[in-house]
């Protein structure tokens, strides 16, 4: 699993002209799922995301987690995170999981984030054409990949 985490002042996702989810301060997370990804990968990411200390403390130092600031999370499925650009100019998405693998794992990931956060996370709609708006705060953008746990 691969995620791009952006610290935001606010974010929203619109599908067919209707706002599906909107959040205030927190994380907007793009998540890409591969065929070989598992619930253990999702669990590892959730633990890291919930504990990630990238919000300012009273001294302006990034030292607080999303739990400590009462932040929110918006999760957007993003198969293009697994694009391969080695050959030619048209990306290949062969590494991205098919719907029958990706949807249950995406739902599990969102559910586990909700449990860790103690409140519902906002989501997009898997496979939909979405319009995502966000105000990146910092900017702070962090990438994580369960195949490269650094």
Curated annotation (Swiss-Prot):
An aminoacyl-tRNA editing enzyme that deacylates mischarged D-aminoacyl-tRNAs. Also deacylates mischarged glycyl-tRNA(Ala), protecting cells against glycine mischarging by AlaRS. Acts via tRNA-based rather than protein-based catalysis; rejects L-amino acids rather than detecting D-amino acids in the active site. By recycling D-aminoacyl-tRNA to D-amino acids and free tRNA molecules, this enzyme counteracts the toxicity associated with the formation of D-aminoacyl-tRNA entities in vivo and helps enforce protein L-homochirality. The lineage of its organism: Bacteria, Pseudomonadati, Bacteroidota, Bacteroidia, Bacteroidales. HAMAP family: Deacylase_Dtd. Its main location: cytoplasm. Belongs to the DTD family. It comes from Phocaeicola vulgatus (strain ATCC 8482 / DSM 1447 / JCM 5826 / CCUG 4940 / NBRC 14291 / NCTC 11154). This is D-aminoacyl-tRNA deacylase. It catalyses: glycyl-tRNA(Ala) + H2O = tRNA(Ala) + glycine + H(+); a D-aminoacyl-tRNA + H2O = a tRNA + a D-alpha-amino acid + H(+). The keyword RNA-binding applies. Keywords: Cytoplasm, Hydrolase, RNA-binding, tRNA-binding. PANTHER family: D-AMINOACYL-TRNA DEACYLASE 1 (PTHR10472:SF5), D-TYROSYL-TRNA TYR DEACYLASE (PTHR10472). A motif (Gly-cisPro motif, important for rejection of L-amino acids) lies at residues 138-139. It is found in: Cytoplasm.
């Amino acid at each position: 699993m691969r995620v791009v985490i952006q610290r935001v002042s606010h974010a929203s996702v619109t599908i067919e002209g209707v706002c599906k989810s909107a959040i205030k301060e927190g994380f907007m997370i793009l998540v890409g799922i591969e065929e070989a990804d598992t619930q253990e990968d999702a669990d590892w990411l959730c633990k890291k995301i919930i504990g990630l200390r990238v919000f300012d403390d009273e001294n302006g130092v990034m030292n607080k987690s999303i739990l400590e600031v009462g932040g929110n999370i918006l999760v957007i499925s993003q198969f293009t995170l697994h694009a391969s650009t080695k050959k030619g100019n048209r990306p290949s998405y062969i590494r991205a999981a098919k719907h029958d693998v990706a949807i249950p794992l995406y739902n599990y990931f969102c559910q586990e984030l909700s449990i860790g956060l103690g409140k519902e996370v906002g989501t997009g709609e898997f496979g939909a054409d979405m319009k995502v708006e966000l105000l990146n705060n910092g900017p702070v953008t962090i990438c994580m990949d369960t195949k490269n746990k650094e």
